[in-house]
């Protein structure tokens, strides 16, 4: 009898479907496996963070394919939502683009989708204010009919780095957020501390840089603990731009959009010949703030550009620097490291979620498209637009200084190596703005063991 029971157990175990493995292109680490194991368990929210270049976006894409159950992906800005293939938080929950009050929480046209959700993935959660996280909680409770459960019983998977992208909070909003929630950051929302605990997973392996000295200095900049020696390492990279050679693929990073536009405009104007304008094709619902590049893209032969999409044939990646070599009506040719390529227009999609009655599941729908050549002028970029990019050569022009927490860290951490980094002027202690309050999550969330 014991033998028969043993055989029966073995047969039942063998009949269970095998868990899917990581998709192609994702090299799992112990941290990746720990995230997947946590989410395959029955309860709890997860906040996944990590230094620049630790693979947060790659992990999000992998988990999207592996998590069992209906999910939706949302982000705080239109461009972030397009990049992650999701929907903005404001659109998904029907929230106004301002400070959110209790009277703004209503039953939503997305109620059917919300009732089916098992997971809600929030990208760039570091930019989400406490009032918005509170609104997400309240909206899910109301629309799912589960008023006593935090987030209506939906599990949150949150990605972001509070050392890089803090929420935008005006002075008049800060007082309300401090009085109501105890602070402006997403982790101040009380629902994250109710019910099943929110856990923290900090990705440890840096993929972008391999230079131990640069990694060490970047860690100190990240934590607002920069020493005189650290500044010495960075300030040894001060060089006038003219000595680097304009032909080299340096990208100037600057804090403000006005300066970036002025630099790009001046370089483009200096090139000989007439400019050609390529108009994007926009269809359906695609907010102008989510456009990944210019709707009217002005180019000349010789223009320095940055590619904005990975190439299917792996000839370039998002962040590759190129030169425009030839322009015709609706045709663009570029040069990358001496090799010529014709570039084709690509389409970015604005997505929405819907409930498919027949299939009884949440499905993605395309609400609109933006079709354009996947590039933008790249003599200069704002530090904010460079967030998420990996660049071989970076020239940092801070001008009068930074104005936001994490800005210097984002700029410095775009570069793969110290050899590829150059500064317009010496970095000062006051350029490294660090808000200790942004680190409050470390005292709130237990750490996932790997």
What kind of feature is each model-predicted range?
Residues 1-450:
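Conserved ATP-binding/catalytic motifs of P-loop helicase motor domains
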């Amino acid at each position: 009898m014991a033998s028969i029971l043993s055989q029966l157990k073995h047969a039942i175990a063998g009949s269970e479907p095998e868990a899917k493995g990581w998709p192609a292109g994702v090299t799992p680490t112990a941290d990746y496996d720990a995230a997947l194991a946590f989410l395959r368990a029955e309860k709890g929210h997860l906040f996944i963070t990590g230094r620049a270049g630790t693979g947060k976006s790659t992990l999000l894409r992998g988990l999207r394919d592996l998590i069992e159950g209906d999910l939706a992906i949302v982000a705080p800005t239109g461009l972030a939502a397009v990049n992650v293939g999701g929907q903005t938080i404001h659109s998904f929950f029907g929230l106004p683009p301002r400070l959110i009050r209790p009277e703004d929480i209503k039953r939503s046209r997305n109620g059917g989708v919300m009732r089916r959700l098992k997971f809600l993935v929030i990208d760039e959660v570091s930019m989400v204010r406490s009032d918005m996280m509170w609104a997400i909680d309240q909206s899910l409770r109301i629309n799912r009919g589960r008023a006593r459960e935090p987030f209506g019983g939906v599990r949150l998977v949150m990605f972001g780095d509070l050392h890089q992208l803090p929420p935008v909070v005006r002075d008049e909003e800060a007082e309300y957020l401090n009085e109501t929630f105890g602070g402006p950051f997403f982790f101040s929302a009380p629902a994250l501390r109710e019910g099943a605990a929110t856990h923290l997973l900090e990705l440890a392996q840096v993929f972008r840089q391999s230079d131990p000295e640069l990694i060490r200095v970047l860690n100190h900049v990240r934590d607002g603990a920069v020493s005189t020696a650290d500044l010495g390492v960075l300030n040894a990279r001060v060089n006038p731009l003219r000595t680097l050679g304009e032909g080299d693929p340096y990208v100037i990073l600057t804090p403000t959009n006005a300066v970036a536009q002025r630099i790009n405009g001046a370089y483009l104007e200096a090139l000989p010949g007439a400019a050609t304008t390529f108009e994007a094709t926009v269809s359906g619902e695609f907010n102008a703030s989510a456009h990944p590049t210019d709707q009217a893209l002005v180019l000349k032969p010789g223009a320095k550009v940055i590619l904005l999409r990975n190439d299917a044939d792996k000839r370039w990646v998002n962040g590759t620097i190129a030169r425009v070599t030839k322009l015709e009506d609706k045709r663009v040719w570029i040069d990358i490291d001496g090799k010529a390529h014709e570039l084709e227009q690509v389409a970015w999609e604005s997505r929405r979620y819907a409930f498919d009655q027949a299939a009884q599941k949440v499905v993605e729908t395309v609400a609109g498209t933006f079709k354009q050549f996947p590039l933008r002028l790249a003599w200069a970029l704002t530090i904010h637009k460079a967030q998420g990019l990996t660049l071989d050569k970076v020239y940092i022009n801070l001008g009068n200084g930074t104005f936001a927490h994490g800005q210097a860290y984002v700029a410095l951490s775009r570069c793969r190596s110290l050899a590829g980094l150059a500064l317009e002027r010496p970095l000062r202690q006051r350029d490294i703005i660090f808000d200790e309050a942004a680190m409050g999550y470390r005292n709130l969330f237990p750490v996932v063991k790997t």
